[in-house]
Amino acid sequence: TQASTRLVTVLGPGGIGKSTLAGLVTARLRGVFSDGVFEIPLAALTQADQIFPAIADATGLKPISEKPLPPQLFGHLGGKRILLILDNVEQLTENAQHFKAILDGAPSVRILTTSRERLNLQDEVVFRLDGLRVPADGHDGNNESVALFLRYALRANPLLTVDDNA
């Protein structure tokens, strides 16, 4: 994506590899974001009011309890080149405005989310992960899904023989 892109959602069904891809992105981009890349698992969160505290904790903010957290968080993140990787946000999509508030309050922050559902925010760029195609007759040895299956089957049993009737 372009340098101006600030919010990317890796979208796909459960188990497709969204979190794995996010982990690879983390490893690759650590040097690009001089103030840090923070992987923040959000699967356990169920309430909107848990979003800002989870991000504050992950990024090292020690909030002043008598002051509202959002302005403290935006001040803490503001001006820093940070990538927030927010993993498993699908149960929080109704509260996507919290993510927009972070982007608005901390203009140099970038966010990558993983989700089964879109956030439906205006500037969201969606990167969809889909499964491999399966041939209708199941006999296409050149098909990616069949080739992957055969590779693992042969790894498990090197003596396995495969023919067109298998």
Which positions does each model-derived feature cover?
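Short, polar loop motifs at secondary-structure junctions
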Residues: 113-119
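Active-site-proximal flexible loops/turns
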Residues: 48, 94-95, 122, 138
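Short amphipathic alpha-helical segments
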Residues: 96-100, 124-127
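Walker A/P-loop phosphate-binding element recognition
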Residues: 1-93, 100, 104-113, 131-132, ...
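Helix-loop-helix "sensor" segment of P-loop NTPases
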Residues: 61-67, 119-166
